[in-house]
Structure formats: structure tokens, C-alpha cells
Amino acid sequence: MALWRSTVIVSAMTMLSRVLGLVRDIVLLNVFGAGKDFDTFVVAFRIPNFFRRLFAEGAFSQAFIPVLTEYKTSRTHTEVQILISRVFGCLATVMTTLTMVAIIAAPLIMYIYAPGFHSDPEKFALATDMFRLTISYLLFMSLTAFASSILNSYGSFSTPAFAPVLLNAAMIAGALWLTPYMAEPIMALGWAVIIAGILQLAIQIPELWRKNLLIPPKIDFKHEGVDRIMKLMLPALFGVSVTQINLLLNTIWASFMQDGSVSWLYSAERMTELPLGLIGVAIGTVILPSLSARHTEQNPEKFRGMMDWAAKVIVMAGLPASVALFMLSTPIIQALFERGQFSFEDTQMTALALQCMSGGVIAFMLIKVFAPGFYAKQDTRTPVRVGLMAVAANAILNVIFIGFFKLIDWEAEHMALALASTGSAMVNAGLLYYYLHKRDIFRFGSHWKKIFLQFMFANVVMIAALAYALSWYNADVSQWMRVLEVLILCVVGVVAYVAALLVAGFRPRHLKP
């Protein structure tokens, strides 16, 4: 039950963060709209945000937690403290250097990253200034991820999971109260991001101190633990960040498309992050320390059992989430974003992107379960090979879909990028499972046939229920009524799905870890 308790804690904090994130997006799109200024913020913040996800949900955690868990399990507390001190010093040194280089090279980075902006000098200059400001978040974010990884390894999940809430709260406050004091109103978001980074790191400190793990940093790149983490992390930097790399590449493509394309894709991506963060990231965060411990204990049966449980939860939640996002795309976008500077055309364009991305939600969630199966065994090379193939698939699919939409003269070219991201995620998840199965690390056993049929039956029932409920949906009402209608649609879907699962014979005890 410890796994469920930890998962519920992380999911609850993630839900709070995601809900506040939706409020944040509503506020930002209402204040700035889906136009040139907001495009510059999305592009400029994409790079530090990429590193945030790389560290908080990616390479650093995947490399550091297994090594720290091994130290905690088989060595003394003093040796653990020494490891933490050395990693702290080395990480702070590398990130400070990287941040300074990025600030100096900001124009070059923006020219490479968003070449389409260069044709508009004002837009390019604003994006460069915004990047110089937001990239400072990189140092605070990396140290926050370091502290969070330590706490997660010791079974403390609530404080690290709460940290993203502060980023959303700071950005809302910046948009509402800092904007009037800025020559360029959008720059208020950059300052809000830096304030959030400081707060996210600060809230970790008391709990580290209580656990006697608040150790002064010392630089020692030759320390055995640091050396192992670096060797694991270098390939993991690519392997666990495929989704973010694809988003970066998609942003480059989108910078050449019509104004608003970056914002439409961003808004649609935010909708997919709700189920991904609530279930996928929560499960991935919780199981990595446990899988690492099972590997250290050399207990393959418990290892496989834990992965089977995680996959079951992911498929049970991910399939209906994908279906619901596709069917409810327009009502959701209308209810959340269509106000102020965000027009009905923006709603249509964002909904199209969301429909294209919805099919990849289950794949993105499965990646969060399959990848830790390798990282817990300190195997970072396999995800790298898979990641290379996924990035190649994304690039090829981008060319194919963009070419096709140009051929048929389709106005919503940004849909091509969303479809390519979905296809790339499916390739990534499929190949990760192939190698897990091939190496007898994890496979869907014969019991999955019944489970899969139960899930499919429940999804069909949910589709029918939502289709009927949508016939009563009315967009010509007040904003709050739209929100209420969407909530009712979601309740109808959940009730229909759960009821169908029970009719099919699925019971809560089947989700026991």
C-alpha cells in the first residue's frame, strides 16, 4: 500500500499544480492573447523549461536516484552525505557555467532555435531579452531537482511534488500585478519565473535539514559516485528527453508558420499534460526508487510485479484520457481559454492540435513506466537507442505531414507537428516495450488479455455516453456555464467508464501492487 499512498500524494499535488496551471494559462491567454508577444515568451521559456523537465522528470533523476538508493541501502549514512555533498558541488558548478554561457550566446541560440523570428527584428529582440531573463531559472531548477531526488529516495514525495505549484502561482501573480510596471508587459513573466525558481528551492531546505541531508557542497568530479552518475547521465540526457527534443524541433518548424501557431500548439500540449502529469509522471516518480531497491536486492519477480502494476494503472487511466481529450477538445478549449484576446479561431486551431495530440497521451504515459525499467538497472544506453529512433521518426513524420498539408493547401499546418509528436511517442513506447520483453525484464502476461478486453469494453461504453452527452452541449452560454457543462461531460464520462469496468468484472483489488 506504500506505493499507492505515495502515488496518491504525488497525484494530489500534481492535480493542484495542473489545475493552477490551467488557471495560469487562462490568465496569460486572457491578458496577452495567442499572438506575437505570447509566442516570444513560449519560445524563450521553452529552453529553460526543457531543462526543467530534463532534470525534474528526466536524466538527472534517472541517473542520480538509482546510485543514491544503492548508497542508502548498502553503505553508511556518512558515505551518503559525502555523495550528496560532491554531487551538489559538481552540479552547481556545471549549471552556473551553462547559464552564463547561455546568457552571453542568447542571440545565437535564439537564431538557431527560432529562425523564423529573425525576419521580424522586434519579435526577435524581444524573444532574446526574454530568453536571457528566463534562462537564469536553469540554476535554481537544477538544484531543486537535486533536492527533490534526495527526498524522493527517502520516501518523501509531497514537498517535491508541491514545487511546481509555486511556478504557476508566480506566473499568475506576474501577469496580474507586475505587467503594469513593465515597459514590455510580457517581460513580467520572465521575472515571475526567476522568483518561482528561488521559492521552489527554498521549500526543500527544511526537510533536507530534518533528515540531516543538508550538506555543504564540495567539488570533486573524481568521486566514485559522481563518476557513475555522470556516466549514466550523459546518455540519459538524450534518452529521457526525446519528448522535449521533439517539442523543441517542432517549435523551430512552428516559428515559420502563421502567427499563433506556437501558442496553439502550446495550449494543446498543456491539455495533454494534465493526465500525463496526474498519472504518468506520478507513477514514474514513485516507482523508480522502488524499482532501484528491487534491483539492488536482486529480486526480479518483485521488479516485474511492480512494473505490471504500474502499466495496469497507466493503461486503465491513459486510454480513456486519450479518448476524452479527442472527443471533448473543442468544449474544453472554449471553456478554459476562449475569452479576452483568445478568439473563436484560436479555439478551433487549438482544438485541432489537441485532437492530433490526444492519441499520443497513452504512449507518453507508458514511456514514464517503461523507461524507469531500464534506469533502475542503471542501463541508460537502451533508452538512448530508442530515443534516436523516435527523434528520427518525428523528423520524418514532420516532413511527410507538412508536405501533405501544403499539397492539399490546408490552413492549419500546425496539425502536422502535433501528429508527428504523437507518432514519435508511439514509436518510443513501442520500442521500449520491445526491449523490455526481449530481455525478460517485463512483458504483458496472459492475464492481460482479459484486462485489455475489460478496458476496451469500458472505453466503448464511455464513447457512447459522451457522444450522447455532447448532443446537449451548448457553447452559446456564459463562460462559467461552459465550464460547468465541461465538468458535467467529464463526470458523465468517468461514471460511464467506471460503471462499465465494474460490469466487465474489474474490481479495485485487481489494482493491488
Language model: regions and residue ranges:
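Membrane-embedded alpha-helical bundles of multi-pass transporters/translocases
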Residues: M1-P513
